[in-house]
Amino acid sequence: MLPLRVAYFVHDVTDPAVARRVRMLKAGGAEVSVLGFRRGDMALADIGGVSAVDLGRTYDARLAQRACKVIQRRSSLGEGQLVVRDADILLARSLEMLAIASAAKRNYAPKAALVYECLDVHRLMLSNSIPGRILRFLERSLMRKARLLIVSSPAFISQYFAPKQGVGTSWDQPVTIVENKMLQLDVADPNEGMRASDLAPGPPWRIGWFGMIRCRRSLDMLCRLAARVPGLIEVVIRGRPARVEFENFDAQVASAPGISFGGAYRPAELGALYGGVHFNWAIDYFEEGANSALLLPNRLYEGGPSGAVPIALARTETGRWLKRHGIGALFDSPADELRSFLEHLTPSAYRGLRQAIQAQPRGLFIADREDCETLVRALAIAGHEQSGARRNAQFAGIHTARSVNRV
């Protein structure tokens, strides 16, 4: 049987999560090509071990510039059209890439199945403003051509796609939830052996804030706590700061006692990073009440194998996920509650929090080869239905939007 050929349209090829998804698709048996924009200066020729077609540079927080790029690429994909013509699946990561992929389907690959992968719901999409209504109309129009919707959190369906975009009713195509789990294809992973138990359970409590750093309110809160109670916490920040969201990120970190920023990191360092902290900061007020309340972030899964205890808001989907599994430290108002919690936290109580995480099944945090095959099978069904063929018994495990499939 020929492998499923997937053309993957991405909004930022430099995002490590893109490389992880590419590896997942390859491990599931698909043949993958990547077409995408980049946030950095340098074009990347290789993403997750496959070739990449550079569509140009775009910028964070510059929606008008990105919209112009999308319009340009809807008209012409350049060398990307060679990749698209042979594809069975056009997989679009984000709304802007769905706009490009739908045009590519019309222009170059009318028989390919269009699949929409939505991993964030921008605050405008939830707004009743005129721009918000226009964007939702655009998304609905583009989704009519899609044969599968992939999301990373069930709240994206229950709080947005079902009530606002008709998923499960007027749009009744399959939905698959692919959580942002770590990907482990090998039997042994050296990172998995790193445990937070290597740290003495007591102050200074070391909090790790890793990944996309974009929450100004979190930084302010942690800096205030570190200054008011010297020796209570140390905060280790690593990753990619969205500097446009901060007044002066570097100066604020440099002036705060007990706060350090160590720059970007490689995925191979995750085990050591999370194994070197007591707590995993999973609070994000960026787009509060909107995307940050609905998503299940990468760091939720990345810290699990190392036993780092997540700190999260109880009212968010992250908090509900942690509560369902009986793990983590949940707060209604961390600005008021975190200090008292840490000051009264005993070594034995902390060990109990950590042991609850380490008692969880491996599959709660880590995706394996079987998960990869399940994802590619869902894509294959989308392609199968696009061709007009009937769904048969071998695809019985994939459900419609009314009964969401999980990977």
Q: Predicted regions: what is each one?
A:
Residues R140-V175, M182-V187, R320, L375:
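A short, active-site helix/loop in glycosyltransferases that binds the activated sugar's phosphate group
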Residues F246-Y274:
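Nucleotide-activated donor-binding/catalytic signature segment of Leloir-type glycosyltransferases, i.e.
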Residues F210, E234-E247, G263:
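Glycosyltransferase donor-sugar binding loop
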Residues M1-M42, R85, L148, Q165, ...:
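N-terminal subdomain of nucleotide-sugar transferases
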Residues A7, I150, R195-R217, L222-A226:
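Conserved donor-binding/catalytic core segment of Leloir-type glycosyltransferases
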Residues E192, S333-S340, T346-N392, T400:
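A charged, aromatic-enriched C-terminal amphipathic alpha-helix characteristic of glycosyltransferases
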Residues P16, R217, A264-Y301, S306, ...:
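Nucleotide-sugar-dependent
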Residues L77-V84, A99, N107, Y116, ...:
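Membrane-proximal helix-turn-helix segments that form the acceptor-binding/catalytic region
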